[in-house]
Design a protein with these regions (language model features):
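Predominantly flavin-linked oxidoreductase catalytic cores and closely associated redox partners
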Residues: 150-235
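Beta1/beta-strand and adjacent pyrophosphate-binding region of the FAD-binding site
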Residues: 3-16
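Dinucleotide-binding Rossmann-like beta1-alpha1 core, especially the glycine-rich loop
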Residues: 52-129, 254
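Glycine-rich FAD pyrophosphate-binding loop
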Residues: 27-48
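N-terminal Rossmann-fold NAD(P) dinucleotide-binding loop
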Residues: 19-20
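Active-site substrate-recognition segment that forms the wall
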Residues: 23-28, 84-88, 194, 199, ...
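Flavin (FAD/FMN) cofactor-binding and adjacent substrate-gating region
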Residues: 78, 98-167, 171-172, 178-184, ...
């Protein structure tokens, strides 16, 4: 059956990390799909940029996620085979902290509940195996061999390329003004045209508040800053020798990844400075107060990586 002009089975607003994946999978199933992205593809707005993203199976936030993560691993491997480029890098992950902290104990609980492979290592054992780690006495780490990272920018591009191959349609630099659910389906008005669809997926990240009124009181964007610091001892921070980590330091959760593409190890702090913002009011300029907590953590707990900051970037 030939579809009517400007009518689709599904319209997806926002072709970032999740929107590109939805476009790919729906087009692969034979649906007529239109993806609308207000920026370039890929772009450095929102939260999709940054070269790499952590992936692990012991999902502490809720053990019910674990079966979904198993499926995600399968899907990433399939996309990697179709694309012919390395996307999924499994060199291990470490969740570290003091033994009485929730992140540490909760991760062990999830691993045990779902029969995931793991080891518990003291701080000195972590340092002996992975010299880039120099955590304090009394800290322990849960090492998961099947954790690692995704080449997130490449993943987004791979999803978009394969969606095109599957017959999907994607428009970059096309801002959506409004949408409405009608008796006959969905109507989407962009700055360029009007489209209709049977279904709508909104994956607009921090811009979703502008499209879904109910989210305005329940989903508040925060300003985040990531840093890349060059190692004094580069071999200790390559992916094969430096597992990705989440670690609680003085009550503050930090995360980090090995040196990949950007000349430096990547480090961030969950919620950073806890600054609520909006896409329109985001202060995109990193400042000394943004850099300081990242450098302090790196210099104290990963001292081989205390060179001058190579890059700071903001996101939502």
């Amino acid at each position: 059956m030939t579809r009517s002009a400007n009518h689709y089975d599904v319209i997806i607003i926002g072709v970032g990390g999740m929107g590109s994946a939805a476009t790919y999978h729906l087009s692969k199933r034979g649906h007529d799909v239109l993806g609308l992205e207000q920026f370039d593809i890929p772009h450095e707005n929102g939260f999709n940029h940054g070269v790499t993203r952590i992936i692990r199976k012991a999902y502490l936030e809720d053990p019910e996620y674990v079966p979904l993560v198993h499926r995600a691993y399968e899907n990433w491997r399939t996309l990697q085979e179709e694309n012919g480029r390395k996307l999924l890098h499994l060199h291990g992950s470490v969740t570290a902290g003091r033994p009485d902290e929730r992140n540490f104990n909760g991760t062990i609980g999830v691993c045990e509940e779902h029969d995931l492979p793991f080891e518990v290592l003291r701080s000195d054992e972590l340092s002996a195996r992975f010299p880039g780690y120099q955590l304090p006495d009394g800290f322990k780490g849960v090492y998961q061999p099947d954790g690692g990272f995704l080449a997130s920018d490449r993943c987004l591009v791979a999803h978009v390329e394969k969606a095109f191959n599957n017959g999907g349609e994607i428009h970059a630099r096309e801002w959506v003004r409004d949408w409405d659910a009608t008796s006959s389906g969905i109507r989407v008005e962009s700055e360029d045209d009007v489209y209709t669809a049977d279904r709508l997926v909104i994956s607009a990240g921090p811009w979703a508040q502008e499209l879904v009124e109910k989210l305005q009181a329940n989903a508040t964007p925060e300003r985040q800053v990531l840093g890349w610091l060059p190692p004094d001892e580069p071999p200790n921070f390559i992916p094969e020798r430096f597992p990705v980590f989440t670690v609680t330091l003085d009550g503050e959760p930090f995360y980090g990844l090995p040196t990949v593409e950007v000349p430096g190890f990547k480090i961030g702090r969950h919620h950073h400075l806890e600054q609520e913002t909006t896409p329109a009011t985001l202060d995109e300029t990193p400042r000394p107060e943004d850099e300081r907590p990242l450098r302090d953590a790196a210099e104290e707990y990963f001292p081989g990586n205390a060179g001058p900051t190579m890059r700071l970037t903001t996101c939502l």
